[in-house]
Amino acid sequence: MTSSADFAFNALASGASKVTTFDKNKFAKYVLALKIATIKTYYSASGYSRFWLKDSPDYLSKRLFNDIKNHLSPRDYEFWTYVFKDNFNLRESNFIRKTMYGTYNMQNKYNIYYNNYYYLLLRQAILKEPIITYDLDITDIFKIKESFDVIYLSNILEYYKEIELLKDADTVHKFLNNLKRLMVKPGGVVSVNYCYWANLLEFCDSLDTTLEDLVNILTLKYPGEYDLQTFSTVFDDTLEGICLTRKLIK
């Protein structure tokens, strides 16, 4: 389970049979639908990359959208057709939020499905409609009456720290313990990605580090609370494949 299209795609490309996603932001589901339609349209990672890589001359272009739109549901078709009409310039707007991928142009480095071998595995999986979506945020996550091998929270806790719903380490620790107790299968894991969020919780607030140094600093500074774990066996020991899993038992 995750709240990120990229993590859902990486999991499917790595062999997951089903992925559950949750997000209260309806726009996120429209973006997911557009990404899935792109995968259904193009038989290679290069075709997908042309539309989604931010340094591509065809990034979010209306021309490629005209190829992709027929793989959208009627609701998603109506939404994206409205967005793309009149040549609305998505490239120069903040319509799709700028992230580290935009700043560093890294999405093809941090997501294995941009590799053609794994893209083809992803495409094969996507055609089986393996992604289940829920209209809720992390504070209502216990309404999902399922259990999972991996719950991948990515940077979600950062946002909820800012709005004080998960405002301190003790609150987050209790939340994660309940998450593991109620929703994780035996031997499963709740994973929090620290690859580019240096101030996720207060014990990270003092860090002033670069993207490249962050994993090592956290590992060395908090050896009792953190251990390294690769999200998938397809990764080597480079930064691209490493995330940090918070131990849930003090």
Put a short name on every predicted segment:
Residues 4-16:
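Conserved SAM-binding loop of SAM-dependent methyltransferases across substrates and taxa
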Residues 27-127:
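Class I S-adenosyl-L-methionine-dependent methyltransferase module
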Residues 139-153:
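A short acidic, Gly/Pro-enriched loop at the edge of an enzyme's catalytic core
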Residues 152, 175, 186-198:
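Conserved beta-strand signature within the Rossmann-like core of class I S-adenosyl-L-methionine
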Residues 191-218:
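Conserved class I S-adenosyl-L-methionine
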Residues 222-250:
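Core SAM-dependent methyltransferase catalytic element
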